[in-house]
């Protein structure tokens, strides 16, 4: 299925809903009131990640790499999980919310990269455009497209770091049992 890009206004709405979901959850409310006029695209199944930063540092990032749920449902669950369920961080406290910036990444479905030789993988990766998933057995790691840019990585460094995110050796992509996928993301921030 081909996915049309979201508009800037739709992206802003997603970011607002993600923040509302976090705020309501931290208040103990189970009744998140969504606008009645949500765009139809919010009901399409899409992959989505919600990233939280506090004063420029990662504070939580959780999402759905695959389009398994309607975007609005996946967004709300990812937002709450990023704030309360990322095992790398303690749960966000209500008093932290003013210092938290919310970012929403809406993903295209991951596509497997087919190569003659594993050494060819880096040539198929567009840093700053593609996100990566590396998978071998039960191990799976994902890095969003913006991560490589933020860290100044080239394509091979991005691939190695995605391997390590999966808990695998950095050169695991040379193993024929390893699968590499790429995807793209539209990234929306609270500041526009």
Curated annotation (Swiss-Prot):
Domain of life: Archaea
Organism: Methanothermobacter thermautotrophicus (strain ATCC 29096 / DSM 1053 / JCM 10044 / NBRC 100330 / Delta H) (Methanobacterium thermoautotrophicum)
InterPro entries, per the entry: AMMECR1 (IPR023473), AMMECR1_dom_sf (IPR036071), AMMECR1_domain (IPR002733), AMMECR1_N (IPR027485), AmmeMemoSam_A (IPR027623), Uncharacterised_MJ0810 (IPR023472)
Pfam families listed in its UniProt record: AMMECR1 (PF01871)
Domain (AMMECR1) ranges: 9-192
Name listed for the protein in its UniProt record: Protein MTH_857
NCBIfam families (alphabetical): AmmeMemoSam_A, TIGR00296 family protein
